[in-house]
A protein has these predicted regions:
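General "foldedness" signal
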Residues: 14, 78-81, 159, 204, ...
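Leu/Val/Ala/Ile-rich N-terminal alpha-helices, chiefly Sec-type signal peptides and the beginnings
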Residues: 42-181, 188
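Sec-dependent bacterial lipoprotein signal peptides
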Residues: 1-3
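Extended amphipathic alpha-helical interaction segments
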Residues: 169-215
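Post-signal peptide N-terminal segment of mature Sec-exported envelope proteins
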Residues: 13-56
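Bacterial signal peptide processing site
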Residues: 5-8
Length: 215
């Protein structure tokens, strides 16, 4: 296609001045071949980084799905554990609870790995929409919620609520609710985007199989 034309164009452009030069001592006039080699090499440079779109999309989806599973399930377990001993989940701890189970923490390494992994995947080109945009919102919300949950876990594990009559526990609960309210709708959108793209990929694979079998 285009590179072939560029090569011919480059050759004619470099060869023309050689022909139009005044009669120079015969075969020694061939140093003009060096620029020809340079001109031929130029079109190859932009053509080299060939992007395999499907490979990039697969890499992105692999990270997105793994991180969803690494974070979503532990978050649900944490919420269930916390709700176990609260009379009113929205109100939070009152200080009158007979049993205090605390809350399950979220793996800090999973939070850190997923934050780095998701943001690196989003930066890969070409973009994969709608999920790239949602993935950033999801990981930001998940990290904020995870950090608050881990602070709560430490507070309850160390039984600090016995020293401050749940004062910090009540403050942490308000931060937790704000984080949770931000996280839940984004998590739903993220899950929907994963399903939407997976459905498209499955349809594309089915078409490929049908085309191959048809032939």
């Amino acid at each position: 296609g285009l590179t072939g034309c560029d090569d011919k164009k480059a050759e004619t452009e470099t060869l023309q001045p050689a022909n139009s030069q005044p009669a120079a001592p015969a075969p020694e006039a061939k140093p003009t071949e060096a620029p020809v080699a340079k001109a031929e090499a130029k079109p190859e440079t932009p053509a080299q980084p060939v992007v395999d779109e499907q490979a990039v999309f697969d890499e992105k989806m692999d990270v997105y799905i793994k991180c969803y599973n690494k974070l979503q399930i532990p978050v649900q377990r944490s919420l269930a554990r916390y709700a176990d001993w609260l009379k009113d989940f929205k109100q939070g701890p009152t200080g009158e609870e007979r049993t205090v189970y605390g809350i399950y923490g979220i793996s800090e390494s999973n939070l850190a790995e997923c934050e780095k992994g998701v943001k690196s995947a989003v930066a890969l080109t070409p973009a994969l929409q709608p999920i790239d945009g949602v993935a950033v919102s999801y990981i930001d919300a998940a990290v904020a919620l995870g950090n608050t949950i881990n602070e709560m876990d430490k507070y309850y594990t160390q039984e600090n609520y016995k020293d401050d009559a749940f004062a910090k526990g009540k403050t942490l609960h308000q931060t937790f609710l704000k984080n949770l309210e931000a996280f839940e709708p984004v998590a739903e959108s993220y899950h929907a985007a994963i399903q939407q793209i997976n459905d498209k990929r499955q349809l594309a694979e089915l078409k490929n199989i049908e085309e191959r079998e048809g032939k």
